Amino acid sequence: MKTFVLHIFIFALVAFASASRDSAKKIGSQYDNFETCLTEHGLTEDDIFSIGEVSSGQHKTNHEDTELHKNGCVMQCMLEKDGLMSGADYDEEKMREDYIKETGAQPGDQRIEALNACMQETKDMEDKCDKSLVLVACVLAAEAILADSSEAA
């Protein structure tokens, strides 16, 4: 059974990190619960931001707040269906485990540090949808930066 390690994406999450290489793909589109969560929120794939747009931060300037919120609700739905969130609360340990499993990251890996920093940055946010999108965006941005720095090395 395929685990939705969006887990980042972190983030959501988790799998989003490896998906960040394909910037034209929609965030979360490669996971089992994507279509279900779209349907539950009355959205289509066209309503969902691309990985490239989110990892670069363009989603914040190119879209209305309602679009941001709706995308976040789809992310939260997928995270919750995969047991990584309950409401607005993360299961941080499960998120780390799934992220490590998805990415192959080892202890001390900067990707794990980035995931931890993103969870810390968003942990006090109360709106579950906004929190989920900010988390996913944080992880994708960190993945993009780390990928760029390793390519430059």
Swiss-Prot record:
Q: Which GO MF terms does the UniProt record name?
A: pheromone binding
Q: Which GO terms describe its biological process?
A: response to pheromone; social behavior
Residues spanning the signal sequence = 1-19
Entry annotated with the keyword Disulfide bond: yes
So which domain of life are we looking at?
Answer: Eukaryota
Record key words, sorted: Behavior, Disulfide bond, Pheromone response, Pheromone-binding, Secreted, Signal, Transport
* Any one of the GO CC terms: extracellular space
Q: Where does the protein end up? A: Secreted
What does the UniProt record say this protein does? Colony queen number, a major feature of social organization, is associated with worker genotype for Gp-9. Colonies are headed by either a single reproductive queen (monogyne form) or multiple queens (polygyne form). Differences in worker Gp-9 genotypes between social forms may cause differences in workers' abilities to recognize queens and regulate their numbers.
What is the name of the protein in this document? Pheromone-binding protein Gp-9
Organism per entry: Solenopsis electra (Fire ant)
